[in-house]
């Protein structure tokens, strides 16, 4: 099955609740590639790449996040790129 790549923008109470670290752990467990970072507007942005089934599992996880997060929306956009591993990036 071909790989898919999505950019996610996650809104709500998603900073200061270990969202990014939890996403890195989840992505590694699912064998995904890409990155995640905080944005200055209080949201979290991620690019997720891998097998469609596993990427969809990550999107479902992103809608919930870790236990202390309160996710109000996840905007999903098609994306491109070629990534190795899943990285925590600096805020923008």
UniProtKB/Swiss-Prot annotation:
This enzyme's EC code(s): 3.6.1.7
Active-site residues from the entry: 20, 38
Record-level Gene Ontology MF annotations: acylphosphatase activity
Catalytic activity: an acyl phosphate + H2O = a carboxylate + phosphate + H(+)
Keywords: Hydrolase
Residue span(s) of domain Acylphosphatase-like: 5-90
Family stated for the protein in its record: Belongs to the acylphosphatase family.
Protein name: Acylphosphatase
Gene name linked to the record: acyP
């Amino acid at each position: 099955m071909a790989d898919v790549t999505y950019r996610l923008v996650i809104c709500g109470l998603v900073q200061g609740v270990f969202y990014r670290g939890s996403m890195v752990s989840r992505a590694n467990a699912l064998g995904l590639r890409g990155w995640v970072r905080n944005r200055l507007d209080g949201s979290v942005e991620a690019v997720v790449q891998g097998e469609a089934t596993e990427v969809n599992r990550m999107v479902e996880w992103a809608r919930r996040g870790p236990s202390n997060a309160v996710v109000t929306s996840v905007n999903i956009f098609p994306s491109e790129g070629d990534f190795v591993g899943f990285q925590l990036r600096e805020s923008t």
